[in-house]
């Protein structure tokens, strides 16, 4: 398969992935295993070594994400994992991890590769780590991370002459914004239901 066809094929898979993510469908992780495995070849061939390494991580993370969504249940009645807001207590450690990962990835790129875009390549890598982690836990804020990653990647792929991927990531930005509002509504319903359950429990104990 030529690089042009590989670019097109993985772009189609990418469209399917984001649609499944928008629908909160577990099959997004299956597509998320196949697509990055093929992207390793595509990115490496264009000198995007950070993205190639990230594609390896995506493949492994998709396996974890599938397991987490499939088998991880809430403690209450073994219900499926709901969409929720990220706890504020996680903000600082997440930010710290991001900056450490950014610095570490940048060091690897400038030391052991001939990457021409080490700053942005390492930036998208580090933020993608955070985004995938947040997605696996169904945190609403994961969409913020992906909006930034997708916008930067779109520009990078234009510069590197990977047109279909550039188009895909430009579209990702739009879909991610729509996905955020869809998930936000779902998160609010979960929060409201939790409040009502607590209120009913409280009322039942009042005399």
Predicted stretch roles:
Residues 1-9, 51-60, 114-124:
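Structural signature of hydrophobic alpha-helical transmembrane segments
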Residues 10-17, 34-40, 126-131, 147-155:
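Hydrophobic, membrane-inserted alpha-helices
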Residues 19-30, 133-145:
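Membrane-helix interface "capping/anchor" motifs
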Residues 57-75, 184:
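Membrane-water interface of transmembrane alpha-helices
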Residues 142-147, 152-160, 164-197:
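C-terminal transmembrane-bundle signature of multipass membrane proteins
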Residues 198-206:
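Short, low-complexity, charge-dense intrinsically disordered segments
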């Amino acid at each position: 398969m030529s690089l042009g066809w590989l670019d097109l094929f993985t772009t189609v898979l990418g469209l399917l992935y984001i649609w499944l993510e928008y629908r909160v469908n577990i099959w997004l992780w299956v597509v998320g295993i196949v697509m990055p495995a093929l992207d390793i070849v595509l990115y490496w061939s264009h000198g995007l070594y950070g993205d190639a390494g990230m594609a390896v991580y995506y493949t492994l993370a998709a396996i974890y994400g599938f397991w987490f969504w499939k088998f991880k249940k809430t403690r209450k009645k073994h219900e499926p994992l709901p969409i929720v807001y990220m706890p504020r207590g996680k903000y600082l450690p997440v930010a710290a991890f991001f900056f450490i990962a950014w610095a570490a990835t940048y060091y690897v790129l400038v030391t052991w590769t001939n990457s021409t875009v080490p700053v942005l390549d390492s930036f998208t890598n580090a933020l993608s780590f955070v985004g995938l982690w947040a997605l696996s836990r169904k945190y609403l804020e994961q969409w913020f991370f992906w909006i930034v990653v997708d916008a930067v990647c779109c520009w990078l792929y234009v510069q590197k002459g990977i047109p279909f991927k550039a188009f895909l990531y430009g579209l990702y930005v739009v879909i991610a914004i729509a996905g955020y509002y869809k998930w936000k509504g779902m998160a609010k319903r979960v929060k409201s239901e939790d409040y009502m359950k607590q209120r009913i429990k409280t009322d039942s104990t009042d005399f």
